[in-house]
Amino acid sequence: MIRAGAISTALDDRRQWKIRRDFPLLREVQQTTRVPAPRPRPLSTVVWNPVYISFGFIHRDLKPANVAVGPVGTPQFRFLHIFDFGLAREYIVMPRTGPPKMRRPRQRAHFRGTLRYCSVNTHEKGEQGRDDDLWCLLYMLVELRGPLPWSKVRERRLISRIKRTIDMEKLLENCPVELLVFAEHLTTLNYYIRPNYALLYQLLLQVMEAGKIRAY
């Protein structure tokens, strides 16, 4: 098992300077480009990179400031790169004997993440799972079309209330319909349920195909 801390250290100590110099942060892309519907940038790489999934951990702080596109003018510009794994946590444990198993969730966890992008479960200090990273991804995708309804809100409880009560169709009114299906699937998940990555990946591919965006 590769430890999240080791990944974070290696990236921060050896390559952070290169990311800052050569890799435009997604936040910078958002501030300079409003993506026309139905053409959100292919963020699927963030979640479905097979290496990321196989590590058995969740990031817990996915946000535009922790995601960078490849160097401008290169083929890597089409791909997104995740960094800053300082808050990552394993959800799979390796016992001394026997197969890997899921870590038992804590009844109450410390808040980890960013208020704008974290899930309702994170606001409520529940144990984060794979679905919580996907909620972060969804909010990032929505923000590519414009500000989130709570973008200018600073009070934590109010942000949580807006996320809990907002109608998904209202939140996604300027987004491709596939993102509504994406969101509906997330509402069926919990800590133990494995997300249907094939379904979610296919939904994002459909968005890309509708916008005539090549995956590779």
Predicted regions and their residues:
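Terminal C-lobe "cap" of eukaryotic-type protein kinase domains
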Residues: 187-215
